[in-house]
């Protein structure tokens, strides 16, 4: 067909640099998934493949539509610009492979997503015990907390099964009180405090010459940097936290300070925030005294 001939010619000329598959139901008027085709004639003659990204699962529900989050957009940009191959997400597909597929550019032909089936262990249901294969699926956690695994689970006489060393309602407490978890928690605090220390001066020195977009760019880049390669933490989740806070709360404050200065905005901090931070005990005493007054008023009325 004509469409196939056009696609073949464009691919063979090397004009397509990348294809990015987006989630369904993003745009009004259509619920089908959309794709971004990156066309770039620069160095087209030397291009021997097309970089493909399947970002169809990175979104959040927003009413009856789906919406890309800040972290979804940032991950797409980072992966594409750096040509990072991630299993089930991105891949550099050679022209030879595309030719073997008759120039079909549908992403599922090249990027395979493995969805694990919910297999039930019948023996475990009938005879009890926790299948070791289920425990082994949490290997990424056991690498960080190697001895917690032995604290939580105990070998049984049946091969392939373990049992809990504590009551189910004690699992959280057992983990939270373990020294390995405490050490990991401290590591996260140290990483976060490192990020905070790096950027305190950026906020303290806000003035009319500051550029708000530059401020959040530096802070968000720093967040990605410090949480890169931290086990069990997705740096893009952390990026989303700072971007959400910026969009919902912090952005307006920064713009006000840049426009009017600190003095003009000295009432930015809510009164209850100051009380909770510096006078919480005094507030508790006031609340107690007010409760006592109410009680006395009720007794007086009763008399």
Say what each PLM segment does.
Residues 1-303:
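A conserved structural/catalytic subdomain of Rossmann-like adenosyl-cofactor enzymes
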